[in-house]
């Protein structure tokens, strides 16, 4: 088995999908998790206005609505959370996403004061924090807020990680990578786009240039620029196609470097890192 084949197997990627079937699978998955854990009543998800949170949010709202209809339990709720750092430049996109999702509840938690307070505390301790590191602090603060909301509402936190991000390790460890359930896991970026099209989302939600937008000095930095490889190449690789040797080497290098992100804290019995 080649490394490419092994990665495809580990991430559960299909070369060809039926978007409607994948939508149903994700919705049923989200429903089944709550039914298996009757003490859980809500799903919580941060909404940025990009493709991934728009899709995950819509799937979550669909699952919750079906659960309410099937069980008669009105405690089932989906809570969408806006988590800007100060003023978000693309706030209009986030509002479009909320209009598409139509969440049961929408909260806004501005993380700027918490992030800046943490930076001041670190600087007082004698540490100068880089802009890149600050970006990771933002990502982790967003998860602190989501877990606080989930803790108060008997909820579970949804993550937006999908196969194209996972293979590249393109998420913050214990930040956006720290979630309870991943309804998009197995899908490539283009497959996620296909699901949004099937759900009749506004094209602006899936045609927008993907960006983590964490760094103050590089606002709106495109994912593909940060990664040095295009999503088309990543998706082709994950769907089993042949790509350039250079792109394949870069993807596989990111895969190896990001292995620690795909594991719980390393124990003495782990050997994947050796």
UniProtKB/Swiss-Prot annotation:
It holds the Pfam family NAD_synthase. It catalyses: deamido-NAD(+) + NH4(+) + ATP = AMP + diphosphate + NAD(+) + H(+). Mg(2+) binds at residues 52, 165. It is an enzyme of class 6 (ligase). Deamido-NAD(+) binds at residues 140, 173, 180, 260-261. SUPFAM superfamilies: Adenine nucleotide alpha hydrolases-like (SSF52402). InterPro entries: NAD/GMP_synthase (IPR022310), NAD_synthase (IPR003694), NH(3)-dep_NAD(+)_synth (IPR022926), Rossmann-like_a/b/a_fold (IPR014729). Coiled coil: none annotated. PANTHER family: NH 3 /GLUTAMINE-DEPENDENT NAD + SYNTHETASE, NH(3)-DEPENDENT NAD(+) SYNTHETASE. Belongs to the NAD synthetase family. This is NH(3)-dependent NAD(+) synthetase. The gene is nadE.
């Amino acid at each position: 088995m080649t490394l490419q084949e092994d990665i495809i197997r580990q991430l559960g990627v299909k070369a060809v999908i039926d978007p409607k079937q994948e939508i149903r699978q994700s919705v049923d998955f989200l429903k089944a998790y709550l039914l298996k854990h009757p003490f859980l009543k809500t799903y919580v998800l941060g909404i940025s206005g990009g493709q991934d949170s728009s899709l995950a949010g819509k799937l979550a709202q669909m699952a919750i609505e079906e659960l309410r209809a099937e069980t008669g339990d009105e405690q089932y709720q989906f809570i969408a959370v806006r988590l800007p750092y100060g003023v978000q430049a693309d706030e209009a996109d986030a509002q479009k996403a909320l209009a598409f999702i139509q969440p049961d509840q929408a909260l806004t938690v501005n993380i700027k004061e918490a992030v800046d307070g943490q930076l001041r505390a670190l600087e007082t301790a004698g540490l100068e924090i880089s802009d890149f590191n600050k970006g990771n602090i933002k990502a982790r603060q967003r998860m602190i807020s989501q877990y606080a909301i989930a803790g108060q509402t008997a909820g579970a936190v949804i993550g937006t990680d999908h196969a194209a991000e996972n293979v590249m390790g393109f998420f913050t460890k214990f930040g956006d990578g720290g979630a309870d359930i991943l309804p998009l896991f197995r899908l490539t970026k283009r497959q996620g786009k296909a699901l949004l099209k099937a759900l009749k989302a506004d094209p602006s939600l899936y045609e927008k240039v993907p960006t983590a937008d964490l760094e103050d000095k590089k606002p709106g930095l495109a994912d593909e620029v940060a990664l040095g490889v295009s999503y088309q190449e990543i998706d082709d690789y994950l769907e089993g196609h042949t790509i350039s040797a250079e792109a394949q080497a870069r993807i596989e290098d990111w895969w190896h470097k990001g292995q620690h992100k795909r594991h719980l804290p390393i124990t003495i019995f782990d050997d994947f890192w050796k």
